[in-house]
Amino acid sequence: MKLHIFNPEHDLALAANQSNYTAPHAGRQLHKDLAFIPALWADENDFVLVDDIDDAYDKVRHLGAIYNKVEFITPLQLSEVFKNTMLIDSIHPWGWDLALVSQLKRLGCPEIMLPTADLLAQLREVSGRRWAAEHLQQDVEFVTDEESLRCAIERRGKAVVKAPWSSSGRGVKYVASPSAFSESNDGKLVAPNLEDTIRWAVKVMKQQGGVTVEPFYNKVKDFGMEFEMKDGKVNYRGLSLFETIKGAYTGNLLATEKEKETVLRNYFNIEHLRNMREVMVEKIEPVLKNLYSGPFGIDMMIYADEEGELLVNPCVELNLRRTMGHVALDLGLSEKSSLHLMRVEYDGNRYHLRVMPGKPSEDAPMH
């Protein structure tokens, strides 16, 4: 029997790298409101950790009785399970980090079921943008001092500066050198004040050891590929067509693989997808073979070059954890009709996972 945990604050916990990390309010709220979602992929009778069992069952019923098959369990109950039984044989969080391991230890989880400190450190390293820059990406550099940062920005004219670890929509700055024009991309303003970005980056360097400097792409559409590492092999699970607002995730298209490929076919020759996938697997599989087991994803991007030709960046981000793209794939398997939208919405008080028929509008395209 498996224990599933939704810890969406994982990316921020990696950045903090502290045993007693407390996420910002928004992260804690998202954790609380969507704690039930592992029920979408858990096996029958698996445990799913939540704070409020009645609330979790109520939410899962709204997604269909097919998901009403798991055992929701509170932290207090989990502590008793660890203390008195051997019911749980493996733990499957959204992502592994020091804060989660410390929490599980406090609940009495046997250490043999948890990653070691050395393994956690390795997972954190591979999860960081520096590792991706050095192993998976092209034309991305990692700088560790202010002078190198200024030179990198001036050399590019316009650039994207990122913290090594951060959640979606955070830890990312769009910047232009004094010699470049200030303009916007996808609603994100290129920082008119270079010095603001420099000060921010210097602070990040002190906390996380450096920042990445990447090309400023004229983005046309986001998409991704979802994988699972199992028994030392990378298995491809499917495409993810997702939507972001100012870099923060808002939703996914639920559709068959053929339908998703049809969407992408409007932008580039999708025969190249297989080659991109094979190249990424060839690079990642040897590294993860003895390090990681579970889901992960790679965010990609369609962009236009200066001549207007559409190209593909095959690795914008490596997410060494479960992703909302995986959730969309699991939900999509159960949908009787295609072209549904899965959205994470905030009503000012709580977060909601909604699934609705339809397709992206022209005003709000689903990337």
Question: What name fits each language-model region?
Answer:
Residues S337-H367:
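Peripheral (often C-terminal) accessory segments that flank ATP-dependent C-N-forming ligase machineries
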Residues M1-L40, E44-D46:
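N-terminal-proximal low-complexity accessory segments that begin disordered
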Residues V140, A159-T197, G224, K246-L264:
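Glycine-rich phosphate-binding loop of ATP-grasp-fold ATP-dependent ligases
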Residues A191-T250, I302-D305, E309-C315:
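Phosphate-binding site of ATP-dependent enzymes
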Residues K206-G210, Y236, Y249-L310, L353-P365:
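A long amphipathic alpha-helix within ATP-dependent nucleotide-binding catalytic cores
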Residues F227-E282, N319-R343:
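ATP-dependent carboxylate/phosphate-activation module, predominantly the ATP-grasp catalytic core
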Residues R28-W41, L49-E154, S167:
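Conserved N-proximal alpha/beta basic substrate-recognition cap immediately N-terminal to
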Residues I153-A176, A201-K219, I298, E317:
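ATP-grasp fold ATP-binding core
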